């Protein structure tokens, strides 16, 4: 079996009226290729249901997964999202698409000819007081009770706080 869609990420970021931005950066696959490569190097298995071998059968063997395909997030909905990303970053911008992108790890016969699409909006383009509204939105979502009683984090929040915790200030000239 051969991949048709890439595992290209979709990303979204916005201000939150605090120092911690809202950043969602997610792959279109159940597992990213880098994690499969690490599992292969360490001789570890990958989770069941995230990849197929070259014969189209589910595998937990990292080496087999690298020779096969990664499965999309959310089943057919994820395939639809991956297709959308393929159209936006391939067809729409005039780069390779639909399984024509060369494997960056195994195919060095020429350029990949990959595409990117970036969109930016002024935060108050549609709503006058965006920062006030996003603050209310985040506050409302964080108040929702969840099954385990754990704190709800918005996308990017844990990573940002982790970076603050494990990063020490450096002299300016060292950067």
Map each language-model feature to its residues.
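Phosphate/diphosphate-binding glycine-rich loops and adjacent basic-rich segments that engage nucleotide
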Residues: 1-62
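A broadly conserved detector of short glycine/acidic/proline-rich loop/turn motifs that flank catalytic sites
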Residues: 16-18, 28, 77, 123-125, ...
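Flexible loop/turn segments at secondary-structure boundaries
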Residues: 31-32, 125-128, 161-162
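C-terminal alpha-helical cap/extension of soluble enzyme domains
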Residues: 130-165
